[in-house]
C-alpha cells in the first residue's frame, strides 16, 4: 500500500492562525498606506509614481482591488492549509493502522485506489471528505460548510479562467477561517 513520504525538512505547512495573522498584518499595512497616499494627495505632496495624477477615488479603487485580491489569496491559503492538514492526518491513519472507525474506513477506501491514487487521493467528491462524511465522526454540516469554500479555492488556485463562482464574493477570510477551524477541531484524535 503506497504511502507518500513527507519530507519534514522541505515541507512548509502553515497553520490557520499563521495565515490569519499574516492576513491581518497585510490588511493593516494596506490601510496605513492608503491613508498615507490619501493624505499626500490632499496636501499635494509627493507620492509613488504609480499614484501620480490619481484622484482620491482612484486611490480608493486601487486599494479596494488590492484588498479583494488579498482576501481571495487568503481564502485559498486557508482552505489549502486545512486540506493539507487533513491529508497528513489521512496518511498517518492509513500508515499507522489505527483501529478507530475513521482510520479503518480510510484504510478500506485506500486499498480500493490505484497505486497512483494511493499517493495522491482525491480530496472532495469521491475522496477523503466523502469518507470522512460517511463515517459520521463529526457533524456533517461542518464538512458541508467547509466544502462550500472549495469552489473559491479551485477558482483562485487554478487561474480563474472560468466563470466566477458565487461563493467568491460571499466568503471572506474570517468566515473561511471559522469553517476550516471547525473542521479541524472536529477531527477525532
Predicted regions and their residues:
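Charged alpha-helical initiation segments
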Residues: 1-72
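Short, hydrophobic, well-ordered secondary-structure elements
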Residues: 67-93
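Generic structural signal for well-ordered, non-membrane alpha-helices
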Residues: 46, 50-53, 80, 84, ...
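Surface-exposed polar/charged interaction patches
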Residues: 25, 29-36, 40-43, 47, ...
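Short non-catalytic regulatory patches outside canonical folded cores
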Residues: 87-144, 163
Amino acid at each position: 500500500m503506497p504511502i507518500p513520504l513527507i519530507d519534514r525538512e522541505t515541507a512548509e505547512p502553515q497553520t490557520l492562525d499563521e495565515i490569519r495573522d499574516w492576513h491581518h498584518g497585510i490588511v493593516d499595512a494596506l490601510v496605513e498606506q492608503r491613508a498615507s497616499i490619501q493624505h499626500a494627495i490632499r496636501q499635494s505632496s509627493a507620492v509613488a509614481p504609480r499614484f501620480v495624477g490619481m484622484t482620491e477615488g482612484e486611490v480608493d479603487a486601487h486599494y479596494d482591488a488590492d484588498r479583494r485580491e488579498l482576501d481571495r489569496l487568503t481564502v485559498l491559503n486557508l482552505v489549502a492549509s486545512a486540506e493539507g492538514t487533513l491529508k497528513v492526518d489521512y496518511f498517518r491513519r492509513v500508515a499507522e493502522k489505527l483501529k478507530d472507525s475513521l482510520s479503518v474506513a480510510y484504510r478500506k477506501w485506500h486499498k480500493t485506489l490505484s497505486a497512483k491514487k494511493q499517493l495522491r487521493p482525491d480530496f472532495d467528491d469521491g475522496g477523503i471528505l466523502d469518507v470522512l462524511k460517511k463515517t459520521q465522526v463529526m457533524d456533517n454540516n461542518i464538512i458541508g460548510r467547509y466544502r462550500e469554500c472549495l469552489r473559491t479555492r479551485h477558482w483562485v488556485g487554478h487561474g480563474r479562467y472560468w466563470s466566477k463562482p458565487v461563493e467568491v464574493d460571499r466568503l471572506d477570510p474570517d468566515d473561511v477561517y471559522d469553517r476550516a477551524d471547525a473542521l479541524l477541531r472536529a477531527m477525532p484524535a
